[in-house]
């Protein structure tokens, strides 16, 4: 729930007349009902309508009194996302371009795996981190999303899956934006979708990825929630990482590793390092050795990512043979590593590509 205190801390939050009903955690809904002279148990009924029956309007909550429905309508909006573009890949990946109530657009991706359906969600409209390989940063940061707008991405995809009796089984917070720059709303989102009364998606089936916002890594280490944690690394030495990720100039590799060690000491949980391979930049065997040396004493996994080409950027794909050699070298040096399966390469599935393409159309 967006409070005055949260708005003070997060200047990029929207200032809507009514906040999304999906932005309330279960405990917040209970307290809100008490504060408005209603019975606490109604929270369970409301959440059932929102997350199990997945209704589109408050008026459909027929076991609530008309009075309570009106109070809810007076205070909250039922966040709806308008599908602007829906692209489906040959491999079953579906990419959605959603329009928000203020006209901004965001991307959400449904990825199908043998082990279930995974949804990649967006946390910001645009991004200001400035990674030089990413299309998400091209227009800068416009605003942060409410927790309810992040929840609505999962719900909208789930409603599409309802037609084939499928369910969202995993969530990755790796879409547009830096989740740790919208920390409070991201944490509310995590607690909402993980709640038994909501979508009940297990914490170990949810992964959040950061570019390395170090103060928030320390905060995340203190959270009492077993969410999987990934770090976009892409370079084991400052020179290369700063070229790819300007955030490294503020939070360099040594400081990042120190924060990650603290996280592991507090949580005893494995960290995944995302390592995109860029032809001629960070994909040689010497780079694999540098990476292995950097992380050798950590409980970690390396996810090697064959990069998707972004027309606005000049990076090229690493040849497949070189990718396999890189993986083999890491394993030889005792590092757990896998190559991410490419999905949606035929449908603008790289982060920010579809939104960037639509923005070009809009501005012509």
UniProtKB/Swiss-Prot annotation:
Single GO biological process annotation from the record: tRNA methylation
GO CC annotations on file: cytoplasm
Keyword tRNA processing applies: yes
Active site: 107, 351
Subcellular location: Cytoplasm
Gene3D superfamilies named among the record's database cross-references: 1.10.150.530, Aldolase class I
Annotated keywords: 4Fe-4S, Antibiotic resistance, Cytoplasm, Disulfide bond, Iron, Iron-sulfur, Metal-binding, Methyltransferase, rRNA processing, S-adenosyl-L-methionine, Transferase, tRNA processing
Top-level enzyme category: transferase
Record family assignment: Belongs to the radical SAM superfamily. RlmN family.
Name of the protein described by the UniProt record: Probable dual-specificity RNA methyltransferase RlmN
């Amino acid at each position: 729930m967006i409070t005055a205190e949260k708005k003070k801390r997060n200047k990029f939050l929207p200032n809507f007349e009514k906040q999304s009903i999906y932005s309330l955690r279960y405990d917040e809904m209970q307290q809100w009902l008490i504060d408005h002279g209603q019975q606490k148990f109604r929270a369970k009924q409301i959440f059932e309508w929102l997350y199990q029956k997945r209704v589109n309007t408050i008026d459909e909550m027929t076991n609530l009194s008309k009075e309570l429905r009106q109070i809810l309508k007076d205070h909250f909006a039922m966040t709806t996302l308008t599908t602007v573009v829906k692209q489906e890949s040959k491999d079953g990946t579906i990419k959605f371009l959603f329009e928000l109530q203020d006209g901004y657009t965001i991307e959400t991706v449904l990825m199908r795996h043998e082990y279930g359906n995974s949804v990649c969600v967006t946390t910001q409209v645009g991004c200001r981190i400035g990674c030089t390989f990413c299309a998400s940063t091209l227009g800068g940061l416009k605003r942060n999303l409410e927790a309810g707008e992040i929840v609505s991405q999962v719900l909208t995809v789930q409603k599409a899956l309802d037609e084939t009796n499928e369910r969202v089984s995993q969530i990755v917070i790796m879409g547009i934006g830096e989740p740790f720059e919208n920390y409070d709303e991201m944490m509310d989102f995590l607690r909402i979708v993980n709640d038994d009364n909501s979508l009940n998606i297990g914490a170990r089936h949810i992964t959040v990825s950061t570019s390395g916002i170090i103060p928030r890594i320390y905060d995340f280490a203190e959270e009492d929630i077993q969410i999987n944690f990934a770090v976009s690394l892409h370079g084991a030495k400052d020179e290369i990482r700063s070229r790819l990720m300007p955030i490294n100039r503020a939070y360099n590799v040594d400081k990042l590793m120190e924060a990650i060690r603290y996280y592991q000491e507090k949580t005893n949980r494995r960290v995944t390092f995302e390592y995109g391979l860029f032809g001629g930049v960070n994909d040689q065997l010497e780079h694999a050795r540098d990476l292995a040396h950097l992380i050798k004493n950590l409980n970690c996994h390396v996810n090697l990512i064959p990069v998707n080409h972004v027309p606005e950027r000049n990076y090229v794909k690493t040849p497949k043979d070189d990718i396999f050699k890189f993986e083999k070298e890491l394993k030889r040096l005792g590092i757990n590593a896998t190559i991410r399966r490419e999905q949606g390469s035929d449908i603008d599935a790289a982060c920010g590509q579809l939104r960037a393409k639509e923005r070009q159309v809009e501005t012509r």
